[in-house]
């Protein structure tokens, strides 16, 4: 190919989440913790819940099916499909191979891509791999599908930080949401902040304090690198003296284990901005010699920059947290659920032309920052209009979910814990509470082979 494909990015998005939820305020009362521990301390209002009828395969089957139907895409037009998930059912067989049964009727088996892991970063890794394919000599002009999906389940003491979801991105050229080339910044290190060494359990091992420090440290490394790379790229494009700071971006979207951490992350961006441009903050000159490593658990510093960043958070980040607040921690899905929340938070005319900064983090750890540009054409029938229109069902669907009592939620979690990886097994939950068109687990035979049906 003589030149790069133009405007490679997101052409369509499909987002699914559980039809059941538990109220976090009711969970506070049930767990006999102080009022506000989950709702104020974590910033969470509701949490999506999967019964034993739903697993990672069923979530992804549902999402792919709906993406293809809603966007009227022929399965023969897909040349790449990659799944980012840490919700592992099999150490050998990938989720991607399960999804290939949806392609059988079309006869299309020429689909590259496979599963990728590393905690909550893997959806971003799958996205980057799809971009590499489209910008390579192997690209044959077809679309790529990126799947970011997980079921987040914790032991009882950490259960309020769970959730579940699956998000698919249809990737191609001439997209209404363009992923900026040449400006990604990454930071990767070894840490035992969050990991899953017990393959017979759905529960992670978590060092909560270290996990927060790793997340914020990764942000501190990625943001200045990203700004520097963006400035250099724009200079090469003839845009001299373009200042890349907090004012350059129209929105900041973060990986969201819980909403309060995202609010703290915006405060870290302001801290970074202060370190880079101290003259902008005349009232903070006494802090000019501040060192990042001394600030992660300094509550006085945190409060100063939380207060300083409040307006920025409200304007440029809070609109991206609707699904995180209502569905919970979706692991690798959460960053892109934030993008969806942003896209459905305002009129399409207000979205047009915006530049969005994205921060992806996965424990262990791996992190990247990158940016998106939204098309300036928001006219009826435009690719941007079609993308956003195909997301209008999400807000009503959030309201249509069925509420569980905390006791019912606890019972569902106990059933999952007792029967995880059991074979043979027939799920006990009713499929009648699932949204229409949902794929669900019908049974597991003695050889651990899973059979699925659609509502």
UniProtKB/Swiss-Prot annotation:
Binding positions ((3S)-3-hydroxy-3-methylglutaryl-CoA): 120, 161, 211, 255, 264, 329, 363
Keyword Coiled coil part of the UniProt annotation: no
Catalytic activity: acetoacetyl-CoA + acetyl-CoA + H2O = (3S)-3-hydroxy-3-methylglutaryl-CoA + CoA + H(+)
UniProt KW Transferase keyword: yes
Catalytic residues identified in the record: 86 (proton donor/acceptor), 120 (acyl-thioester intermediate), 255 (proton donor/acceptor)
Domain of life: Eukaryota
Keywords: Lipid biosynthesis, Lipid metabolism, Steroid biosynthesis, Steroid metabolism, Sterol biosynthesis, Sterol metabolism, Transferase
GO MF, one annotated term: hydroxymethylglutaryl-CoA synthase activity
Pathway listed: Metabolic intermediate biosynthesis; (R)-mevalonate biosynthesis; (R)-mevalonate from acetyl-CoA: step 2/3
EC number(s) from the headed UniProt entry: 2.3.3.10
GO biological process, one term: sterol biosynthetic process
Protein's job: This enzyme condenses acetyl-CoA with acetoacetyl-CoA to form HMG-CoA, which is the substrate for HMG-CoA reductase.
Family label: Belongs to the thiolase-like superfamily. HMG-CoA synthase family.
Protein name (database record): Hydroxymethylglutaryl-CoA synthase 2
